[in-house]
Amino acid sequence: MSDNYNRKSKRLFNGEILDDNQSWQSFVRSTEAFTPLIKHIYQINNMQLEEISYITLASNAVFRIGDKVIKIFYPPEAGIRDSREYETEVAVMNHAEVTGVLAPRIICNGMVQDGQYSFGYIITNYIEGILARDAIPTFDEKEKRKFAVKMREIMSKFNVANNTIKIPRFDEPAYLSNPVWNDSLESFKEDRDLCIKNTNFPETIVAHGDLIWANVIIDKQERIHLLDFAESVFAPYYYDWTAILFLFYYDKVMIKEYFGDCASDNFFENLTMSFLLPARGPGFGGMKWAIAKDFNVDVNEITKSIVDVNALKNILIKWFDIN
């Protein structure tokens, strides 16, 4: 693995990024915008360039090049995004390798400057397989249970403490401002802030931070690989639970296989907190729709009923009990 910082006065990125995420998102699937930059990256790493193809919509630019994938990160000079995403991804990919969790393998990584922007990049192997997004809807009950057991085994290895890496903490102010709660009642938002402030959190572990359908892939040998660690944080062990529910499409078979006895001490307190904390990911937005569907009510009724944190916990308890 190399870690290069290469300065280049000539413009290599074919675009102008305004200080908003929408501007960046207009480029992330454009091979034309990134081809000169990718050619330069391959040249400085003495790698042979093959056809560049767009691979998936993500918060950063991701392209397939033969049997490899290149991920190019939002440049800090453009403003609004967290400039630590590149360093976080590298650190947590190495954490995954150390803990025995399957993930893309870093071939090379570094920073390259094109005269206006500095881009972090990572080149990894390409994993041939099917995304959880496409695989899970085809599962029968046996396959659901098998997948949930495998995910539990993976996360038990991944969600551990690691004092050798430097990544953001879950309780940094910017990470506690989740827009998913913007449409909530003021009484709930005030109680959420108070609850977080007064909670004595357990020791932090490495949390994935964005464990959604598109970030889990099943290869041809039916092995599960985790993808995209740019939003990983040090957080309590239950931080990823919200995303796990979303990953499972809120399916009760997989949820119960993964979590086991939901009546155990503090389960619902911790589950509730897992909805209060995450800065990104599905949050409570997807959960509200699942609850509304099972309760046969309008989703706005769910929003209006959550007057405080205890109301949220009681709704979760009721939802778990109906099946």
Indicate residue ranges for each PLM-predicted region.
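Juxta-kinase regulatory segment immediately upstream of eukaryotic protein kinase catalytic domains
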Residues: 2-47
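Active-site acidic catalytic loop and adjacent metal/ATP-binding pocket
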Residues: 58-66, 193-241
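Glycine-rich, phosphate-binding/catalytic loops in enzymes
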Residues: 139-142, 225, 242-245
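Short glycine/proline-enriched coil/turn segments at helix->beta-strand junctions
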Residues: 46-48, 65-69, 98-102, 222, ...
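ATP-binding pocket architecture of kinase catalytic cores
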Residues: 51-166
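An alpha-helical support segment within catalytic cores of ATP-dependent transferases
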Residues: 29-45, 111-112, 143-149, 156-209, ...
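Active-site activation/catalytic loop segments of kinase-like enzymes and analogous catalytic loops
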Residues: 238-266, 275-319
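Short, flexible/disordered intra-domain loops and linkers
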Residues: 22-27, 76-85, 287-302
